[in-house]
Regions:
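Helix-adjacent hinge/juxtasegments
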Residues: 57-105
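Short secondary-structure boundary segments
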Residues: 15-16, 41, 87-88, 124-126
């Protein structure tokens, strides 16, 4: 049985590492003539450079790529096309590294999503299902990621959890 998923409103796609969440999120745009891809990752090492290249080659040329590691609220506001944001947890890591006010940044993001008049799909890692991290920074990241996902899910029209390439609609 093939399920169809509509691209409308704000959609949050959650999943673990290599769960297929980005591939699923991209598939939501297959009926779009054009779309924007907001990348939050920076190519700071060879592994991340290779990961970014894989994502770019998979997407094809209908996408306009915007690179914004920190101020994604402003980037969402400027974009007039359907938009894919990949990924919120890398954005969170960038904010933590810069010691930004996470509550304020998340509130700005949620407001921007509510004000946006085009579909927005956001990809984020679900990191809270494993063991308690050993170090303080990793525990804080896990906790902040959980809070971020909750806040975005609360304003999203739809939420999916992707496991082993299989999307489950939660909301």
């Amino acid at each position: 049985m093939t399920m169809t998923h509509d691209l409308s409103g704000t959609i949050l796609v959650l999943g673990g590492a290599r769960s297929g969440k980005s591939t699923f999120a991209e598939s939501l745009f297959k009926a779009c003539g054009s779309a924007a891809y907001l990348a939050t990752a920076e190519a700071l090492d060879t592994e991340m450079t290779a990961r970014i290249a894989r994502h770019q080659s998979r997407r094809g040329n209908k996408w306009t790529t915007l690179e914004e590691p920190v101020d994604i609220s402003a980037a969402i506001t400027r974009t007039r096309d359907p938009l894919l944001v990949d990924c919120l947890t890398i954005w969170l890591s960038n904010l933590m590294h810069l010691e930004k006010d996470l509550e304020m940044e998340t509130a700005d993001l949620c407001q921007g999503l509510q004000d946006h008049d085009q579909p927005v799909v956001l990809v984020s890692n679900e990191v809270g299902g494993g063991i308690v991290p050993e170090n303080k920074l990793a525990r804080r990241f896990r906790d902040e990621a959980g809070l971020l996902n909750q806040r975005v899910a609360s304003v999203a029209d739809s939420v999916y959890l992707v496991t082993a390439g299989l999307p489950q609609k939660l909301k």
